[in-house]
Amino acid sequence: MLYPKKVGTLPVENSDQEKQTNEIKIAIPLLTNIDIQGKTITADALLTQRHFATWLVEQKKAHFHFTVKGNQKGLFDDITYFFDNHNQKPDHTTIDYDHGRIEERQIWISTDLNQYLSFPYVGHAFMVRRNIIDKKSGKKREDFAYGITSKTPDEADAATILQDNRGHWCIE
């Protein structure tokens, strides 16, 4: 197992030196010898790559849960356009009272884009809206996040997808 000394570096074998890495190039070699079959691999927008998604599903029999941002412009534009023009109630909502704030998370999921999106193995596209109130200052903030997962409706509902999304941040 590799244990980086700091983000963006890997130890050089048989040495205390470190070498710089590129997350996109190192993700597959890092996961190659790890049994992730049936597991969900979450990744931020940098790793939202077609080759990585295909490798996870076909070679490792794992699921992906990817954040979609502007580095995948066409994908991002399609998902944001769909949800920004999707006037329905959220599919699931949670409220947490931790870390000095009140945080409401709402998720909308859809399979309507699965065949349209130019991305392999999409089971759902989703949008998460976070409404955050700082209890001390009263300051309010609203954030939106968009993404895709390989989990199909038989494998995940809105609550599960929201849990996967939130779970991604437990490491950072």
Please name every model-derived segment.
Residues 1-52, 60:
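Conserved, well-structured functional cores that handle cations and Mg-NTP chemistry
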Residues 51-54, 76-78:
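A short acidic (Asp/Glu
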